[in-house]
Amino acid sequence: MCLIVFSSLEDIKNESEYSFILLANRDEYYDRPTKSIHWWKEGYLAGKDLKAGGTWLGVSEDGRFAAVTNYREDPTVRESSRGDLVKNFLENQILAEDYLQTLNKQDYAGFNLLLRDSTGVHYLSNRGGDGTQINNGVNALGLSLIHI
């Protein structure tokens, strides 16, 4: 099971020494080809899904962060890879809140998306809700909706 645990301070613009703390585990099929964490030419640090070309977690040189987990449900086939959600956010300088508004959520199998930029930490799932900003506290995200 993919699991992300994170702690975020209410005022991340203050940028204290530890304004964002992350623990993450990716649980994927062993036979799915991947490349280990490395700097992409586009300027972010992430592993790479060699099957679909995206990534599940990454951070840019300027501190922007993105991660995605699957949403537990019967498998569905979609044209768009969930790994592109992370990749596209990190490759563009759009604000997290604006990026979430541009997504065609129905194009993807079930997902939970976590983004961080200069405006804060943002969460969106295509299996419930319109997305939300997470201002503080310790939160955990797995294969179901986050409870804030």
Which residues are covered by each model-predicted region?
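Internal, conserved structured core segments that host functional sites
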Residues: 64-143
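Conserved small/polar residues in nucleotide/adenosyl-binding loops
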Residues: 146-148
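Extreme N-terminal starter segment of soluble prokaryotic enzymes
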Residues: 1-2, 19
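A short linear-motif detector with a strong N-terminal bias
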Residues: 1, 35-37, 45-47, 90-94, ...
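Short beta-strand scaffold segments in enzyme catalytic cores
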Residues: 3-7, 55-59, 110-116, 122-123
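Glycine/small-residue-rich interface belts in oligomeric ring/scaffold proteins
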Residues: 10-85
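Intrinsically disordered, low-complexity boundary segments flanking structured domains
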Residues: 6-11, 53-56, 99-102, 130
